[in-house]
Amino acid sequence: MNRPVRRGAALAASAAALAAGLAACSLSGGTTAATGGTVILVTHDSFALSDGLLESFTEQTGYAVKLVAPGDGGALVNQLILTKDSPLGDAVYGIDNTFSSRAVDEGVLAAYTSPDAVAGMDTADGHLTAIDQGDVCLNVDHQWFAANGVAEPTTFEELVDPAYEDLLVVTNPATSSPGLAFLLATIGHFGETGWQEYWRGLLRNGLLITEGWSDAYYVDFSGSEGAGPRPIVLSYSSSPAAEVGDDGVARTGNVEATCVRQVEYAGVLAGAANPEGAKALVDFLLSDAVQADIPGSMYMYPVTDVDLPAAWVEHAPLAADPITLDPAAIAANRTAWLEEWAALLG
């Protein structure tokens, strides 16, 4: 995961205040009896919750929480597979829909879905519970396009037009979670026989590819605190909320047709030393307190119907019709797609 960490003070304060007000609430369901002991949560390195939330879980259940973070989302799943005979912990958070099938197929997860799981969201055959969601989208710098008299792009296809030459920066799908999501979005949009030619067109039109999100967004993009030359960047649907000025106007926006949905899950690890504690923690991640805290702490959207910060509602809604791919298809083809993509670059 490489998520925006810069956000408006009002946004962070409102999310923290809402979470603090809810933190004293009991869990909405699942395992709540105080039993004691420690539950180890294995997670990616972007996991964060406001002060006091994990402490409230301990007060409610008796379980202390220890965190283990082996890396980003891809590294997380790889480490779970490598250590499945001697699990790193009891529960896991941060497996997303691009890796969920692989985690299940490799046998790293026990069968458990929270009784509070949101209806209609994938459970990986009863092994995972959706906790948060978001969209990876192209973002545009409104001010740049207005100042240069160029229409903002609204489709994938426009980006290979000479009018947008040298304007786009994305991240490497082999080294970046959003980069992989964008590659999958192009496969979902153009199909398995059309995406390669689309990427050739992007490359001919001056596409810049960076290794990570931070460089693309803060160095090469013109619409954030960097002074980069490129007004189109691969980022997140939530990013424009962090770019709202004191005047209440968003300096950036999403190209909604390019948005691809990302869902993050929690589950119980097979062979967990404390499976009951793990179940209780999975349930807790769906509590109102945690769900309300997710936007301000992890810059993702909750999966339940808790209120979003006002800036998100106005400037950074989830896409109404995002691109989605079957997790099993991703698991079966990820390596081949990445190899084909690398071959395009020569």
Q: Whereabouts are the PLM-identified features?
A:
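Mature extracytoplasmic/periplasmic domains
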Residues: 260, 264, 269-325
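Ligand-binding pocket segment of bilobal, Venus flytrap-like solute-binding proteins
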Residues: 184-257
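Extracellular/periplasmic bilobal clamshell ligand-binding domains
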Residues: 311-346
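Periplasmic solute-binding protein
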Residues: 97-107, 123-151, 179-189, 263-267
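Early extracytoplasmic/lumenal segment of secretory-pathway proteins
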Residues: 25-102, 222-225
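Short beta-strand->loop
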Residues: 109-116, 127-130, 157-160, 231, ...
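Short, low-complexity disordered leader/linker segments with a strong preference
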Residues: 1-39
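A structural signal for short loop-to-beta-strand junctions that line the ligand-binding cleft
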Residues: 87-92, 110-140, 157, 166-173
